[in-house]
Amino acid sequence: SLDMAYNGFFGHQSPDGRHHDARVAAFDRRALVKYSAENVAMVEAVRGRWNQRDAVARLHGNLMDSPGHRANILNPDITDVAMGVVRTKSGVWVTQVFVDLTGALTAPLPVRMRPGQRLDMTPALRGWHFQNFGAKQAGNRYVALGRAIPAGLHGDIELTANGRMRGEQPGLYYTIRLPGPAVTVGR
């Protein structure tokens, strides 16, 4: 909401090209998210004024009258919700972020890391057995990390926790790659 209000846009993609999943990865330093969705709504002030009661009703209507937004609000698989509200002279912006939080790191991940730095943690995954960490790079390229940031890796990455679950039949397994926090790897 703050990004939209002060950077003059309204939508799910910010001017720098980021979507809600990138914002979740930037701000929550422990979350491992299986699914996420975002709702945005806005009410503009008319001639510099707005009616608070009317604005709340209009924002609520904007969200509940949209089939996609309503589906996000009523989704039974959502485990956590975050909401941001910003009021300025020009209007009110509301952002709702919905996640299926499937796991968490045991400690917050640093914002900046360096090659060789250890990843001495085993995340708790709901329903999955942790296998290893990975790094999602630009262009959806993935690199296995093991227990440390490898030499040669640099720039912005998104940590992933890779898990495995036994299937219904012997020898059948499911795998998952859960997006985690964003990290800048420096040299």
Predicted segments — roles?
Residues 14-100, 130-167:
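A well-ordered secondary-structure block
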Residues 1-8, 124:
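A short alpha-helix/helix-coil micro-patch that ends at or immediately precedes a cysteine
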Residues 104-187:
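Beta-strand-enriched, solvent-exposed domains that form extended recognition/catalytic surfaces
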